[in-house]
Design a protein with these regions (language model features):
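Transmembrane beta-strand segments of Gram-negative outer membrane beta-barrel proteins
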Residues: 46-48
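N-terminal signal peptide
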Residues: 2, 11-36
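N-terminal amphipathic alpha-helix/helix-capping segment at the start of soluble metabolic enzymes
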Residues: 6, 37-44
């Protein structure tokens, strides 16, 4: 692997880890340790960003009307996850999204790709909408835009509402295509 790309990969991994990690802007004067790598090394319009999935970062697993997902069920079975960890709190982005976005902005990211928790919008996977879940994502998107960052949204990251798994057998059911369409159209 070319050394410049290895450094970029290390920067992206370090910056995505949070935890107070600070990285110099890749275009900063005197950043010779980057081997000349800077934003100018990429095509005009290249978007620098970071990405997460709802279950891995949001936390607030049973807060404000969110229903359980298949990941909640799986992670709460002792021994399924190392150290019996789960996403109940995670990094608590649900309550700390402004801090997270501010950190992304301070690292000079242009965009943030995140997934929406289907069970935060539709606690039962279908039917009644959870207005508090909708408000959370509206607030996150609006704050990203306010900070000049582009939101990229992933509608599904392997966190099917548990109610749909139990009622229809999950993705093995042909009914899921219609249910996902309803969710996406919302």
């Amino acid at each position: 692997m070319d050394a410049r790309w290895a450094v970029l990969l290390a920067l992206l991994v370090a910056s995505g880890g949070g935890g107070g990690v600070r990285v110099c802007a890749a275009g900063a004067k005197g950043a010779n340790w980057l081997g000349g790598l800077s934003r100018a090394s990429f095509p005009k319009g290249f978007v620098f960003g970071t990405a997460t999935s709802a279950y891995q970062v949001e936390g607030a697993a049973s807060t404000n009307g969110r229903g359980p997902s298949i990941w909640d069920s799986f992670a709460h079975v002792p021994g399924n996850i190392a150290g019996n960890q789960n996403g109940d709190v995670a990094v608590d982005q649900y309550h700390r999204y402004k801090e997270d976005v501010d950190l992304m902005k301070s690292l000079n990211f242009d965009a943030y790709r995140f997934s929406i928790s289907w069970s935060r919008i539709f606690p039962d996977g279908e039917g009644k909408v959870n207005p508090e879940g909708v408000a959370y994502y509206n607030n996150l998107i609006n704050y990203l835009l306010q900070k000049g960052m582009t939101p990229y949204i992933n509608l599904y990251h392997y966190d099917l509402p548990l109610a749909l798994e139990k009622k229809y057998g999950g993705w093995l059911s042909a009914k899921m295509a219609d249910l996902f369409t309803d969710y996406a159209d919302f």
